[in-house]
């Protein structure tokens, strides 16, 4: 071949590599130096099949993807980051991520996913961050999370989660941040957070929580932040928070439906006296009931909540004492009356003999 032709071919290959056009999917941009394929905002309905095999990062956000088939990432074993946020994904097929053994970050936020397949986590043993926020999930099953053993951050916020299977997060030994705010949970059960000894932040804000079981947080040995604001709590059990055995845990409890009475004052008094528990928003906690205290800050009335109860107890105690004393006096009078009567009756025969 003529030297000039060879030279031109060499230049062409060099240009193709430099501009990242070699084996690049149509309507996407490829950057060989960073192994990055950018398909963001291209109105694509399917994940391209010709994504280069050496790709580390795929940005497929802001497209029209409606489902993720099992073959979507076939052969892309070197992938580290997959961004699929803000699409229209309604269904994730079984085995969809099974060919991504080195994946570290998966973003599925802002889609329409209503259910995770049972094998969702198969092949995701090295995943560090999973974002599923702003979807339509209603129930979490344990099988979907089984293999996320390296996960450090899980974002499930802004879904429709009403229930979770007991032990759903049990295999997530390295989890540090769990975001469950803005869902529809009503009861925090004791089995939800088993084995999460490394969890540092648990966000449960803006749910419909009315009750928390006593041992719900007992296994969280590293918890530094517990967010419970914006729920429907009226009362809480001191044992629920006393079971949190950490170096220091900050609590967020404002914007609930607190019934401000002596019981609540005593519980918060105990919590505030525990050295490792810190209610960061205590000054913003307000009363919802009783009606005469609605809207008042708890800190403004907490010292008075037990006064009325104490006064009532004193009145009851005084009434009981008066009743008891009156009964004793009456009994004593009756005793003396009966004694005098018996004495008079016993003198009758002697008087008649003397006469």
Regions from the PLM with identified roles:
Residues 37, 56-60, 79-84, 103-108, ...:
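Conserved hydrophobic beta-strand positions in leucine-rich repeat
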Residues 32-88:
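LRR N-terminal entry segment and analogous cap-like coil->beta motifs
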Residues 42, 63, 87, 108-111, ...:
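Consensus "Asn ladder" position of solenoid repeat domains
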Residues 3, 14-20, 24, 30-36, ...:
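Membrane-proximal C-terminal cap and juxtamembrane stalk of leucine-rich repeat ectodomains
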Residues 1-10:
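Classical eukaryotic N-terminal signal peptides for Sec-dependent ER targeting/secretion
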Residues 44-49, 68-73, 93-95, 116-119, ...:
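The feature encodes a structural signal of leucine-rich repeats
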Residues 31, 45, 50-55, 66, 74-79, 89-90, 98-103, 113-114, ...:
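Leucine-rich repeat
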């Amino acid at each position: 071949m003529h030297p000039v032709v060879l030279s031109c071919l060499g230049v062409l290959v060099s240009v193709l590599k430099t501009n990242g056009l070699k084996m690049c999917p149509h309507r996407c941009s490829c950057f060989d130096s960073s192994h990055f394929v950018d398909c963001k905002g291209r109105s694509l309905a399917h994940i391209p099949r010709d994504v280069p095999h050496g790709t580390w990062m795929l940005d497929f956000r802001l497209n029209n993807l409606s489902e993720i088939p099992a073959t979507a990432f076939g052969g892309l074993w070197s992938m580290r980051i997959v961004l699929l946020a803000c699409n229209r994904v309604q269904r994730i097929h079984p085995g969809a991520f099974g060919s991504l053994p080195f994946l570290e970050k998966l973003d599925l936020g802002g889609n329409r996913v209503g259910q995770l397949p049972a094998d969702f986590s198969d092949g995701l043993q090295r995943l560090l961050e999973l974002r599923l926020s702003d979807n339509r999930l209603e129930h979490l099953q344990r099988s979907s999370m089984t293999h996320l053993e390296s996960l450090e951050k899980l974002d499930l916020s802004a879904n429709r989660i009403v229930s979770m299977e007991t032990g759903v997060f049990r295999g997530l030994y390295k989890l540090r941040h769990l975001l469950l705010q803005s869902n529809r949970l009503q009861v925090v059960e004791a089995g939800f957070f088993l084995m999460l000894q490394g969890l540092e932040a648990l966000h449960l804000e803006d749910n419909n929580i009315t009750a928390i079981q006593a041992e719900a947080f007992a296994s969280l040995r590293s918890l530094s932040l517990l967010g419970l604001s914006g729920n429907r709590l009226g009362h809480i059990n001191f044992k629920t928070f006393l079971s949190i055995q950490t170096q220091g845990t900050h609590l967020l409890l404002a914007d609930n439906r607190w019934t401000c009475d002596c019981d609540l004052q005593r519980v918060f008094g105990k919590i505030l006296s525990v050295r490792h528990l810190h209610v960061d928003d205590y000054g913003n906690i307000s009363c919802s009931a009783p009606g005469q205290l609605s809207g008042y800050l708890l800190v403004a009335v907490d010292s008075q909540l037990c006064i009325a109860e104490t006064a009532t107890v004193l009145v009851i105690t005084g009434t009981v004492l008066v009743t008891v004393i009156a009964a004793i006096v009456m009994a004593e009078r009756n005793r003396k009356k009966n004694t005098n009567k018996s004495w008079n009756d016993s003198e009758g025969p002697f008087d008649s003999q003397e006469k």
